[in-house]
Amino acid sequence: MSVIELKDITMSYGPNRILEHFNLSVEQGTFLTMIGSSGCGKTTALKLMNGLLTPEQGTVCINGTDISHTDINELRRGIGYVIQEIGLFPHMTIEKNICYVPNLYKSPDKAAIAARARQLAKTVGLDAEMLKRYPSELSGGQRQRVGIARALMNSPKIILMDEPFGAVDEITRKRLQEEILRIHEELGGTIVFVTHDIKEALKLGSRVLVMDQGHIIQDGTPAQLLKHPATDFVRRLVAG
């Protein structure tokens, strides 16, 4: 079953056409990584998926429903979203940052929310004592883990990740990659992960999408990209 569908999407920023007649379907349980040249439309596609952008033409469907006919806030409650600049609230403890969305919607069971936050902290590799700290007291890698925990708080079936590990050092990045693979294996769901790092795309993705100038150049497994690159652009990309 396709949980994400972008159908005949056209999208521009001013005079610049970013996506043109763009089509993408993502099946339940897929870990899709998206990679390509700067400005090729990866982030735009991601923002269309959770309604941050509205296409000029075409349809975005989540779980079979055209999102233009749904409550956008309700849609986003069911989608985890992780970006490079995590956007934690500096005046809130880590626990309150993780619990922000359910508290925003005034969920009545505060004890269950707190227990869920502790569980997720453990899931992403954070010690329980860190929940009482503030973002400024954590390293970049730790803050990124908080961002992932916050995205998981509502048990979303879809997680969108836009270069989430781009601002951390190489050792931390590798640890976070292992964590997100483990989380995907444990919790299931569908992940769409934008990256500029081909090694990361090939390591994480069960399916890898290569884009250039608003078009899909190749869509396949990591092995297919490595063994049978569709174009010179893909060949240069996988060669590193």
Language model region names:
Residues 50:
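Helix-to-loop junction immediately C-terminal to a conserved catalytic motif
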Residues 66-80, 104, 110-114, 225-229:
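ABC ATPase NBD coupling module
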Residues 134-138, 142:
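Conserved ABC ATPase signature
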Residues 153-157:
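A short, proline-enriched helix->beta-strand linker immediately N-terminal to the Walker B motif
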Residues 219-220, 228:
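ABC ATPase "signature
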